[in-house]
UniProtKB/Swiss-Prot annotation:
Seed storage protein. Its main location: secreted. One of its GO terms (cellular component) is extracellular region. Glycans are attached at N147. This is Seed allergenic protein RAG2. It is found in: Secreted. It comes from the Eukaryota. InterPro entries: Allergen/amylase_inhib_rice, Allergen/soft/tryp_amyl_inhib, Allergen/tryp_amyl_inhib_CS, Bifun_inhib/LTP/seed_sf, Bifunc_inhib/LTP/seed_store.
Amino acid sequence: MASNKVVFSALLLIIVSVLAATATMADHHKDQVVYSLGERCQPGMGYPMYSLPRCRAVVKRQCVGHGAPGGAVDEQLRQDCCRQLAAVDDSWCRCSALNHMVGGIYRELGATDVGHPMAEVFPGCRRGDLERAAASLPAFCNVDIPNGTGGVCYWLGYPRTPRTGH
């Protein structure tokens, strides 16, 4: 009977400790906004509806140059693109903005959002090259993205998944 009281007391102490720690953390983070990507990283909220127009031009030029970093892109255009990407205030939203931009490029060209990576979306530019150029822009621009590896957006690893347009 005494051992049950000890176990019960220990469990009660653990529960009270967890609740106290949770309350302390909630109080500590009360001024910070914590959200999932889906709540904030939407066109018109986390980034503009027509996102990154200068980056669209960079991606198209890189694609025709078959993704060579800096290939066929003049310095002013690169700087403009990098400023636009860095201006997406929430670094968590940068890959979402680039994904939305790629969907916009496809719509502008009359291409579907999904297709084979080797399919051309415009002369000299294959779908896979376009997506690779877009996903690599954070590394190209040296801007922080917490949701990718080596400055490359996470969605590049899923080239055959449907694009949501945001």
